Amino acid sequence: MNKIQDLVRNFENHISKVNSENPDFFQVVAELAKTYGYPLSNAAVFNKNLLKLKNLKYILVADNPGMTEQEEECYLVGKAGKMARNFFANSSLANNFDEEVAVLNKTFIHTKSTLDLKKLKEFKNLFVESQVFMANLAVDMLEASDCELWITGCSELTEKGLFAQYLKTLKERCAENPALKEKIFFYPHFSFGNFSKNLNVVRTSHPEMSVKEALKAATLNIL
């Protein structure tokens, strides 16, 4: 876990650096948040729950920090987060979610809606750099542990999608280490029950499968 802890600390330091070096960035994101009627706490968001990791079993990637996430500095803590936690608990995949599941995002930049990231046009370079950083962080964690990487929310994870750079970085890392592909899985987002709906299609067709077997069969063809 020492390597994982080093990666988490580096992530925390990187977020502090981004926020301190880009005051204009905070102001623009704050103005966007204001249109939705809430004050901004953090434009670039670290996940404090990563500091609780003790026995890493899964790396779970969502899209970007939303309103509650930026306020609490924790990833996946809204409705989708509750669905994710319930799934891991009910499927006996994790006894203690915060200690066993590292939750990351495809970018650390906050917007209320993921598609609002398109409105931050003047910070396109930072958005691209954030995707590279987060993709490398996920793969670095994967290489430093004996776990699986689950990437949820794939509608914008295409060559021309919002998270094209994240996908490109993943492909580059997998080209360097092809064995990684066996440990990376892609699923719909937990929001609106899409993750469970996708999995249930497989489980209905193959009732003989265990949850873990069904999860492997349900992965989307992205890489």
Tell where the protein language model's regions lie, with residue ranges.
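Glycine/proline-rich loop-helix segments at beta-alpha junctions forming the active-site rim
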Residues: N2-D6, N10, T111-L223
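Short acidic (Asp/Glu) patches
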Residues: L40-F46, V77-N90, E129-A135
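Active-site and ligand/interface coordination hotspots across diverse enzymes
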Residues: M1-V77, H206, S210-L223
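Short, well-ordered alpha-helix to beta-strand connector turns
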Residues: N55-L56, D98, S145-C147
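Short, surface-exposed acidic-centric catalytic microdomains
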Residues: G81-K119
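Glycine-rich anion-binding loop/nest that anchors nucleotide
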Residues: L60-N64, N105, E148-E156
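A structural preference for long, well-packed, hydrophobic secondary-structure segments
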Residues: T35-G37, T68, E72, S91-N95, ...
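Conserved beta-strand scaffold positions in the cores of enzyme catalytic domains, especially
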Residues: L60, V101-V103, K183-F186
